[in-house]
Regions:
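Gly/Ser/Thr-rich loops at beta-strand to alpha-helix junctions
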Residues: 54-64, 84
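Long, low-complexity, Lys/Arg-enriched
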Residues: 1-50, 66-114
Length: 114
């Protein structure tokens, strides 16, 4: 089993723009992964690439780089910064622009109640 768990959560920004929230979690006991762990890591099925994707989780910069690359077909890609919100780092639409900060509240996990 891969030590990087990915979850896609349908969500929307505070302004009501729909997007998909890609949350990752590192499941090792010490919270450490190796570069080899991204080999074969696939995005969850059912992602709607006609919407944007916000990536969120605590992990190394090279994991973020890999996930941004994998999410490239999406309308836009943002990285969550807890101090700012979602910072758009790539876009294929006029809806948002690179460097734009989208305000959002973190969604609950799909499997959680409430």
């Amino acid at each position: 089993m891969n030590p990087i768990q990915l979850e896609v959560i349908p969500h929307q920004t505070q302004e009501g723009m729909p997007y998909q929230h890609l949350r990752f979690q590192i499941t090792t006991d010490d919270g450490v992964i190796a570069p080899a762990d991204i080999k074969g890591l696939k995005l969850p099925e059912g992602i709607q690439f006609n919407q944007g994707i916000v990536i969120e989780g605590k992990g190394p910069i090279w994991l973020y780089g890999y996930l941004v690359h994998e999410c490239h077909p999406a309308a836009w890609v943002g990285c969550y910064d807890p101090r700012l919100g979602a910072v758009v780092v790539a876009t294929h639409t006029h809806e948002v622009s690179v460097s734009q900060v989208l305000k959002l509240e973190l969604p609950a996990s799909v499997g959680s109640k409430g």
